[in-house]
Every structure is written in structure tokens, then in C-alpha cells.
Amino acid sequence: MTEARRRQFKVGRVVSNKMQKTVVVAVDYLKPHPLYRKIIRRTSKFHAHDEQQCRIGDIVRIGETRPLSKTKRWEVVEIIKRNEEA
């Protein structure tokens, strides 16, 4: 029998909330260039389940979960900082 994996968490910014109960979260990370070794900033986008609470620009923590749809494998665990402008 396989061991249960620890749940992974990521912190990112909400870039889209146009879908029902789904937000797109952009997570920035730093990675060295393979040849020149300069540190460059990269961005990954994740679709996360949200019960229509997040707004664009919010900083959120997302956690890994079971597959909820074709592209959704994450859920919003908490809203760390609300966007003041929206």
C-alpha cells in the first residue's frame, strides 16, 4: 500500500475570477538559467476551487486536493491579503 503524501501549499495572486467557483492563481518562483546561472523569475498559473470569495489581485494560499475537474487540482485555503482597489 502506498503512503499518503503531504499536502502541498503555494502562495500566489489571483489573476482571474471570471469562472464560477474557480479562480486562476499566478505563482511566481525563482529559477537559475540553465546555461548562464542568472536567477530569473518564472510564473505558473493554477486553476483553484473557490466558493466565490476571491477578487482579482488578492494574495491567497492554495492547497493540493483531489482532481475536481480536467484542470482543477487546487483549492483556495485562505485569503492572506485582500486587494484594496477592487
From Swiss-Prot:
One of its GO terms (molecular function) is rRNA binding. Belongs to the universal ribosomal protein uS17 family. GO terms for cellular component: cytosolic small ribosomal subunit. It comes from Roseiflexus sp. (strain RS-1). This is Small ribosomal subunit protein uS17. Part of the 30S ribosomal subunit. GO terms for biological process: translation. Keywords: Ribonucleoprotein, Ribosomal protein, RNA-binding, rRNA-binding. The keyword Transport does not apply. The keyword Ribosomal protein applies. InterPro entries: NA-bd_OB-fold, Ribosomal_uS17, Ribosomal_uS17_bact/chlr, Ribosomal_uS17_CS. The lineage of its organism: Bacteria, Bacillati, Chloroflexota, Chloroflexia, Chloroflexales. It comes from the Bacteria. One of the primary rRNA binding proteins, it binds specifically to the 5'-end of 16S ribosomal RNA. CDD domains: Ribosomal_uS17.
